Amino acid sequence: MQKLAKREEQIMQVFWTLDKAFIKEIIPELPDPKPHYNSVATMVKILEDKGFLAHEAFGNIFQYYPIISREDYQGHAMKDIVSQYFNNSYPSMLAYFAKQEKISESELSEIIEIIKSSKK
């Protein structure tokens, strides 16, 4: 799975939220400054070529929908982050956030419970 550029990820976030959308429905959901319609149309076509989106035709207008789930992309992105920055070590990643005080004790406990329940 390819890593997406920042604007591509923003567009995919909109599709994952809306499920299906025409290009004109995507633009208001994107952060400012709003890109031009043609720019969004180009990026949507690129996302379709990369295998992230597909479309259904309504005459000469296309409604697009994601074929890669948010969860699948998140998993791939997290594997890349852990590989690139934490030497493939999830404990190192968690330790980093704990040391930076980005994770509270209650959040750490919640993570431990999630890990325990996923092992069952």
Predicted features and spans:
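Short helix-capping/hinge SLiMs at alpha-helix to coil transitions
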Residues: 15-19, 68
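Short, cationic-aromatic polyanion-contact patches
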Residues: 4-7, 58-77
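Short, hydrophobic-biased segments on the C-terminal half of alpha helices
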Residues: 41-45
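Amphipathic alpha-helical dimerization/coiled-coil segments
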Residues: 76-117
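Pre-recognition alpha-helix immediately N-terminal to the DNA-recognition helix
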Residues: 9-14, 25
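Short beta-strand "wing" residues that participate in macromolecule-binding interfaces
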Residues: 55
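Glycine-centered, phosphate/nucleic-acid-interacting loop/turn motifs that mediate DNA/RNA or nucleotide
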Residues: 51
